[in-house]
């Protein structure tokens, strides 16, 4: 989908586009698709700007590599800061509505936001470290 309200987050330039949109349009709500390190960081920054944030994550926990006990602690902290969680839901698409975007979920009602950020499948760029002979985990 081509929409000025839908953002991917893979590069520094993507961050600048998100910041420009927030400064210019003053969104009241955002849906973050992805609950890994980057998704949580962006959700935190958007909340600090007073934006209502919902994180949608296909696995039933944030920070999927963590064990369930640690994830439970993270869920509690995130909720304490006003972030809503929609865990265990698959995103099937997006639809423009009411000046924002609906995030269409499989077998669930859609979630509406003034903007949507996709922070999924992001892995660190490690080519330079690998070429330098550094050990990678």
Language-model region placement:
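A Rossmann-like FAD-binding core segment of flavoenzymes
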Residues: 48-137
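Conserved SAM-binding loop
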Residues: 7-8, 32, 55, 118
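Phosphate-coordination loops involved in phosphoryl transfer and adenosine-cofactor binding
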Residues: 3, 24-29, 88, 97
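Rossmann-fold NAD(P)-binding glycine/threonine-rich loop
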Residues: 2-3, 12-14
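Rossmann-like NAD(P)H-binding beta-loop-alpha module
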Residues: 13, 17-66, 100
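Conserved beta-strand scaffold positions in the cores of enzyme catalytic domains, especially
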Residues: 6-8, 85-86
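Gly/Ser/Thr-rich helix-start
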Residues: 1, 37-40, 122, 134
